[in-house]
């Protein structure tokens, strides 16, 4: 018997668009800022993974087309929208989504890059926009306060209350200065209140010690947790791509290196005031599969638990700071970092190479929130292992 029939798997064509063959149509990163005239697409899941949106930017003859689709995880199409008219003046690089519970409303957050407008030296060539889409049409809200430059914004629906959280910079060069909060009307998208919270001294000490004139850059939104009293805890990661040379038997070739560095975790009150912000020093670089790099995070009540691969022991830095270093190695050590409701940090080694002999895909666990379990997959070649971690008052020893 074929194993797929044993699980009752079936195939269904969701979308079909006439074009030249595209070898890897989902390979375009949602953070890619290059806009060509070819075929590009991106897929975005909502927070509880109950739905996913697909954007498709392509050409039909001489015309550029931009289509947006929303599907439930049962693969039923909930929305189909032609966004083509909006890309005549702007290119959109969407980053995050939120959906209504009935999946009839889609909120898309991202950068809108102006195509023809002229800019002075103090302006950026893009602005953040939130786009609300229903079958009846769309509406847009821009975030463009003078002297404030939002970054990595994320829309969230909390009991039908629409908010957006992220970071902001005082200059256009993406040197982040703090946390941004916007409360919005979920129907009109009008901004009802907003707050800009500068990074705290604690956060800057975490990241830089006593270094002066240091900067926070390249933060990409990662995850969000709503506490029982509706406080907002969100995390982001310092992520960027560099290019380098690699030599092999065929000569020199240019390769891309993907950097997953420091983790930022911050807590805002339900009204948008910052309670704390912490920085966790980390450095990782990979040339390929990101599953073994980065981190995963699990919110439990008022506490946050972060899981990362790291070397045998974190490196000690100045001012009682530590650095978690390159995680993907032949020694699969997994550390758990706990941040409590006051922002206090603690950590311990959760898994070492005596328990699990294969590298763990630490950034892609299966999360069962109903039972407070995380299931991690470990793999090298044809060898595989599974690791289960249970979250209670504190993480227990993993059972395999």
Q: Which residue ranges define each predicted feature?
A:
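Conserved blade-ending motifs and adjacent loop-strand segments that build the rim/top face
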Residues: 140-154, 191-218, 273-295, 330-335, ...
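C-terminal structural cap/anchor segments
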Residues: 247-248, 267-323, 332-334
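Beta-propeller blade signature
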Residues: 1-4, 10, 65-76, 121-138, ...
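Long, internal scaffold/assembly segments composed of regular secondary structure
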Residues: 98-111, 116-236
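Blade-level signature of beta-propeller repeat domains, shared across WD40, Kelch, NHL, RCC1
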Residues: 367-400
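Short, conserved, GDST-rich strand-edge loop motifs in beta-rich repeat architectures
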Residues: 50-64, 111-124, 167-179, 237-259, ...
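Structural signature of eukaryotic scaffold interfaces centered on beta-propeller domains
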Residues: 28-51, 95-105, 154-160, 172, ...
């Amino acid at each position: 018997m074929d194993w797929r029939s044993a699980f009752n798997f079936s195939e269904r064509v969701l979308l079909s668009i006439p074009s030249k063959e595209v070898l890897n149509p989902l390979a375009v990163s949602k953070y890619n800022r290059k806009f060509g005239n070819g075929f590009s697409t991106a897929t975005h899941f909502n927070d509880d993974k109950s739905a996913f949106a697909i954007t498709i930017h392509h050409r039909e003859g001489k015309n550029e087309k931009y289509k947006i689709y929303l599907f439930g995880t049962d693969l039923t199409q909930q929305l189909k929208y032609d966004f083509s008219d909006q890309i005549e003046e702007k290119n959109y690089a969407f980053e995050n989504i939120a959906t209504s519970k009935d999946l009839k409303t889609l909120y898309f957050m991202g950068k809108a890059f102006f195509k023809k407008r002229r800019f002075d030296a103090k302006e950026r060539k893009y602005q953040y926009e939130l786009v609300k889409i229903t079958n009846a049409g769309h509406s847009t809200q821009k975030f463009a306060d003078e002297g404030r430059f939002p970054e990595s914004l994320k829309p969230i629906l909390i009991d039908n209350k629409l908010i957006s959280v992220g970071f902001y910079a005082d200059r256009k060069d993406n040197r982040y200065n703090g946390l941004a909060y916007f409360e919005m009307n979920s129907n009109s998208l009008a901004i009802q209140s907003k707050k800009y919270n500068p990074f705290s001294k604690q956060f800057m000490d975490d990241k830089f010690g006593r270094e002066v004139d240091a900067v926070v850059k390249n933060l990409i939104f990662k995850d969000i947790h709503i506490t029982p009293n509706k406080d907002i805890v969100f995390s982001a990661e310092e992520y960027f791509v560099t290019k380098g040379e690699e030599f092999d038997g065929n000569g020199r070739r240019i390769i891309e290196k993907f950097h997953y560095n420091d983790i930022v975790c911050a807590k805002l009150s339900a009204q948008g005031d910052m309670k704390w912000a912490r920085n966790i020093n980390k450095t990782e670089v990979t040339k390929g599969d990101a599953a073994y790099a980065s981190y995963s995070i699990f919110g439990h009540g008022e506490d946050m638990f972060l899981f990362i691969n790291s070397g045998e022991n974190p490196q000690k830095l100045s001012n009682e700071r530590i650095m978690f270093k390159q995680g993907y190695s032949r020694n699969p050590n997994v550390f758990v970092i706990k941040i409590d409701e006051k922002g206090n940090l603690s950590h311990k080694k959760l898994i070492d190479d005596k328990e699990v002999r294969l590298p763990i895909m630490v950034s892609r666990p299966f999360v069962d929130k109903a039972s407070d379990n995380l299931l991690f997959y470990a793999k090298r070649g044809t060898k595989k292992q599974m690791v289960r971690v249970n979250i209670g008052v504190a993480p227990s020893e993993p059972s395999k």
